[in-house]
Regions:
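N-terminal binding-site loop/beta-alpha segment at the start of enzyme catalytic domains
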Residues: 1-71, 122, 189-190, 256, ...
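Alpha-helical scaffolding within the catalytic cores
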Residues: 2-7, 55, 59-62, 87-92, ...
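CE4/NodB-like, metal-dependent polysaccharide N-deacetylase domain
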Residues: 10, 85-106, 125-129, 150-151
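Acidic-and-aromatic substrate-binding clefts and catalytic sites of carbohydrate-active enzymes
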Residues: 25-28, 46-56, 78-85, 111-114, ...
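Short, acidic/polar
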Residues: 25-38, 81-97, 143-146, 167-168
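A structural motif
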Residues: 42, 98-101, 132, 156
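A short, structured active-site edge motif that brings together acidic residues
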Residues: 68-81, 103-109, 163
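Beta/alpha (TIM)-barrel catalytic core signal, keyed to glycine-rich beta->alpha loops juxtaposed to Asp/Glu
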Residues: 109-275
Length: 275
């Protein structure tokens, strides 16, 4: 079996290509989920202030027998905190029981309040101080990203966006790549696989490779060069989602999955959300 792949970000830091998402998990659930994930081999955990489970993540990490430098921990600056990223980060670090973050992401641009450029400047300062190794964004459209770059000269290393077979965001993914921004997929299984796992091509590939539909979709993300963070609190599924290193999809198979794209957004519109 091949080793789990890592991605080198444009700032020189590296991150695992596959991590555990903990959206909607309670503090109690997240402790058990992370314990299982670390046991299986995950080293990247993606949380957020808005998930209200940073304390659970912190407890799980504190109890883990994995060295801090082997872990890659991400959390996110919530919309209400865009005016005070320093205070928000310090609160997150306290809950996570960490001295530094591997990745700090601005959760949404919230153009209605128009603080995202100033928030980004604050995040740049936090990175310079060593409180955060890498900084990036979530849910930013091309015009939001361009403005950040134009006004600060600092490009996010990650743009974490809704991305799954029904919403492939190929134009944004390509723009990110051109600007050396790594695209990361949230809701990678289209919220439990509805409308995806029952697609003929997914079922056929699952049969061909002796894998589950979820494993096929996760492998699709990996083979498209995306960082992917499937969310689960179910031990068997956490293990299943990580058992994807012993096969690859070929170019034609990736092309067949590309045909499933409907531009079907399941989450909020980044131009409208918040404010």
């Amino acid at each position: 079996m091949a080793n789990p792949t890592i991605i080198r970000l444009q700032d020189g830091n590296v991150m695992p290509q596959l991590g555990l998402g903990v959206w909607k998990a309670s503090n109690e659930e997240v402790i058990a989920a992370i314990h299982k994930a670390l046991e299986v081999g995950y080293r990247s955990i993606d949380t957020a202030t808005a998930y209200q489970n940073e304390e659970g993540v912190g407890k799980a990490l504190k109890a883990a027998s994995v060295a801090r430098e082997e872990l890659f921990i991400t959390t996110k600056l919530w919309n209400d905190d865009q005016k005070c990223p320093r205070e928000a980060l310090q609160e997150s670090l306290k809950k996570l029981q960490l001295d530094y973050l591997d990745l700090y992401l601005m959760h949404w641009p919230v153009p209605a309040i128009d603080h995202y450029v100033d928030a980004w400047k604050g995040m740049i300062a936090l990175q310079k101080e060593g409180l955060v190794k890498s900084i990036g964004v979530c849910n930013f459209q091309i015009h939001h990203l361009q403005r950040l770059i134009d006004e600060t000269g600092v490009t996010p290393v990650i743009n974490q966006i809704e991305l799954h077979p029904l919403m492939q965001q190929r134009q944004l993914h390509a723009w990110n790549a051109t600007h050396k921004i790594q695209t990361e997929s949230w809701s990678p299984l289209a919220q439990g696989g509805e409308g995806v796992f029952d697609q003929k091509v997914i079922r056929e590939l699952a049969d061909k490779y002796g894998k589950t539909p979820a494993q096929i979709v996760i492998r699709w993300h990996l083979d498209c060069g995306l960082v992917v963070i499937p969310k689960s609190v179910t031990p068997s599924r956490i293990a299943e989602n990580f058992a994807v290193w012993d096969f690859r999809l070929d170019k034609d198979e990736l092309g067949e999955i590309a045909k499933l794209d409907q531009g079907k957004r399941l989450g909020p519109d980044p131009d409208q959300f918040g404010g």
